[in-house]
Amino acid sequence: FRDPDAFYSLVDQNTNSTYDAAPATIGGAELDYVRSVEKASQVYSKTVKAAADRVKTNKVTYPQNNGLARSLQIVSRLIAGGLSTKIYLVSISGSSYDTHFNQGGENGVHAQLLSNLSEAVSLFVQDCEQLGTADRVAGLTFSEFGRRVAENGSQGTDHGTAAPLFVFGKNIIGGKIHGHNPDLVNLDSRGDLLMEYDYRQVYAASLLQWFGTNTDVMSQTLFREFSALPLFQETATAVETELNTLTQSM
């Protein structure tokens, strides 16, 4: 959602507090499930709105023509407002990075997309710092796929495999690049880059070093054990925090 108040209004105006009993049929069981989702949405929307109401304004100005920045603007308020959600997912809408055509050079479409990403992340980090939440916030980027090395016939690049990602925040081990420069000559049979690290090594680092889980939990979550890249300082936020206790008591 783009606005906590709008989300609350949407749920609040389209719910019913009383229902007739669902029939004792397969369809009735499905109806009960839908109703349970509705009730959970009511509780969730009130919790989200309460967190947003505690912090009415951000400490930095986010450009409204940058969709990612607008999303991170909301996330920053909700974190500062005490919402105990551990993972926030924001995305760049549409197929912006799916640059099959007219990808451009240093001033082209892809360069502008990276500039928007840089601007949004920079403002978010500054905002968290000024709101006093930076010690508890880290972020990472990911994508469904990378891009092929060779240019296609439309001045773009097609779907590929390996791709870089960024990790950011106050308590990461920053200023480092993991891996070597991509080998643009020795490719796989389809012309794709050969990966150096499995992306799940980044998720393993997030679980072990940031959330403070153990190896068993990491293995269950990722369906096998992975060696974690050294990405986060030894200041894990853990699954339970003082903020959780504070939020639950409000």
Residue ranges and their predicted role:
Residues A236-M250:
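RTX-like calcium-binding, glycine/aspartate-rich low-complexity repeat tracts
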Residues H159-G160:
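Phosphate-handling catalytic cores of nucleic-acid transaction enzymes
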Residues F1-L131, A150, P164-K170, K176-A236:
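Feature for exported/extracytoplasmic and membrane-associated proteins, marking the mature portion
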Residues V137-G146:
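Acidic/histidine-rich, metal-coordinating catalytic segments
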Residues T133-D135:
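Glycine-rich, charge-dense phosphate/pyrophosphate-binding loop(s)
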